[in-house]
């Protein structure tokens, strides 16, 4: 069980987004401090903006766009 520590955020997300974050952590270690369960992670607060930007990029990349 993790202890309280300054600079950590509890992130709750669906399993798909969680897997994307875990993949980011494999490529750039130090993002995820600990996996809590299927929908929760402890994330390094100083890397949160990087995670948000990368998630947005990856989700946009994988979203179907209708051409008009």
Swiss-Prot record:
Gene Ontology biological process terms in this record: nucleotide-excision repair, preincision complex assembly; transcription by RNA polymerase II; transcription initiation at RNA polymerase II promoter
InterPro entries hit by this protein: TFB5-like_sf (IPR035935), TFIIH_TTDA/Tfb5 (IPR009400)
Compartment(s) of residence: Nucleus
Keywords from the UniProt entry: DNA damage, DNA repair, Nucleus, Transcription, Transcription regulation
Gene Ontology CC entries for this record: cytosol; nucleus; transcription factor TFIIH core complex; transcription factor TFIIH holo complex
Keyword Ribosomal protein: no
Domain of life: Eukaryota
SUPFAM superfamilies: TFB5-like
Pfam families (UniProt xref): Tfb5
UniProt keyword Transcription regulation present: yes
GO molecular function (one): RNA polymerase II general transcription initiation factor activity
Transmembrane segments: none
Subunit architecture: Component of the 7-subunit TFIIH core complex composed of XPB/ptr8, XPD/rad15, ssl1, tfb1, tfb2, tfb4 and tfb5, which is active in NER. The core complex associates with the 3-subunit CTD-kinase module TFIIK composed of mcs2/cyclin H, mcs6/cdk7 and pmh1/tfb3 to form the 10-subunit holoenzyme (holo-TFIIH) active in transcription.
Known function: Component of the general transcription and DNA repair factor IIH (TFIIH) core complex, which is involved in general and transcription-coupled nucleotide excision repair (NER) of damaged DNA and, when complexed to TFIIK, in RNA transcription by RNA polymerase II. In NER, TFIIH acts by opening DNA around the lesion to allow the excision of the damaged oligonucleotide and its replacement by a new DNA fragment. In transcription, TFIIH has an essential role in transcription initiation.
Family: Belongs to the TFB5 family.
This protein's name: General transcription and DNA repair factor IIH subunit tfb5
Organism: Schizosaccharomyces pombe (strain 972 / ATCC 24843) (Fission yeast)
UniProt lineage: Eukaryota, Fungi, Dikarya, Ascomycota, Taphrinomycotina
Gene: tfb5
């Amino acid at each position: 069980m993790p202890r309280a520590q300054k600079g950590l955020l509890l992130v709750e997300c669906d399993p798909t987004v969680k897997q994307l974050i875990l993949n980011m952590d494999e490529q750039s270690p130090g993002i995820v401090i600990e996996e809590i369960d299927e929908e929760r992670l402890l994330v390094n607060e100083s890397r949160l903006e990087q995670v948000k930007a990368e998630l947005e990029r990856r989700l946009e990349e994988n979203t179907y766009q209708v051409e008009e």
